Amino acid sequence: MSKNTAEIKKKILMIATGGTIASKKGADGLTPELTSEELLSFVPEVKEFCEPTCVQLMNIDSTNICADDWLKIENLIEKNYDLYDGFVICHGTDTMAYTAAVLSYLIQNSPKPIVITGSQKPIDMEVTDAKTNLSDSFRFCVSKFASGVQIVFDGKVIKGTRAKKTRSKSYNAFSSINYPYTAIIQDGRVMQYDKTRGRGKPKFYRKLDTKVGLFKLIPGANPLILERYFELHDAVIIESFGTGGIPSDGTSGITSGGTGDNFGFYPVIEKWQKKGKILVMCTQVVNEGSDMTVYKVGKNLKEKYGFLESYDMTPEAVLAKLMWLLAEKKRPSDVKRLFYKTVSEDILYTE
């Protein structure tokens, strides 16, 4: 390798946070133990095309991740942004889509790539997807059009606001929801589909509001549970059926205090909507999104109570966007106004 070639290698910061990729098997099951340096040692080939540096930010099972951890990741990237050409975050798969969505709002318009990856099998296993995923992440980072927050997994590059874990064990664990892949990586080659990239300087945000709840609707659900959600949160996402709606027939099988009095969802929603709570409707159906205008159970609700609607957004992105918006804009009117503003291709279809 010539001196000139070595001089133009891109500098990539690898941030290790734990997850399956760094886990070792013990008596109680898999636990993250490997360090960032140990992870990098399994993919020595990346040093041929970039200059990697490692940092161990945390070493946790991603099930345990929380808002404070997301802010630590943002802070580390912000402090090192001008020193590196890209970032690779090693992360557990279980909450990877949430982290990708949150970082997409905390770090906006980044002309540099911020890649999140992991694996379904630990990297020190004889048969594993970890080495390929980690190597592919570095390859994407140094590619010409790489930018923004992306998940790299099983040869697919997925925008951070569009990723969802759709398989619990298979190597092709993540899908891009209602949006095409950013790129495909095959045999070490990056085939870029999306050649747009952020211009100028990125915008960093340093706050999240965790008073956002997600209520998953089930047939015959107790409205009192939704009441409790509103008591604890400033914004509530209702993950409903199909295109979106709420049971409108009387009690939904529930009586208030055993008196036999009707206690349906509508009185609960009306009460808290008047108190300024943010209400968002999304769907449990993975693909094609919501449309509350289709059925009476959705249309009446939207017109009467001013529900926001996720449309083609993922629930992970809706949750992350509300956490970001509530931290920046305390007035419900501002949150509602900005909810439909596209950030990192999170939403394409609106009213």
Regions found by a protein language model. Name each.
Residues 6-11, 15-19, 23, 35-46, ...:
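Accessory alpha-helical/coil subdomains and C-terminal extensions
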Residues 100-131, 138-144, 272-283:
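Short, acidic/small-residue loops that bind anionic groups at enzyme active sites
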Residues 253-351:
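ATP/nucleoside-binding phosphotransfer catalytic cores, i.e., glycine-rich phosphate-binding loops
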Residues 116-186:
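Internal gly/pro-rich beta-alpha loop/helix module
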Residues 1-79, 287:
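ATP/NTP phosphate-donor binding region
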Residues 28-37, 95, 101-113, 130-136, ...:
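A glycine- and small-aliphatic-rich helix-loop capping segment at beta-alpha/alpha-beta transitions
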Residues 24-28, 100-101, 126-129, 159-165, ...:
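Short acidic, glycine/serine/threonine-rich loops at helix termini
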Residues 90-112, 248-253, 261-268, 298:
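Short Gly/Thr/Asp-enriched flexible loops that form oxyanion-binding sites at enzyme active sites
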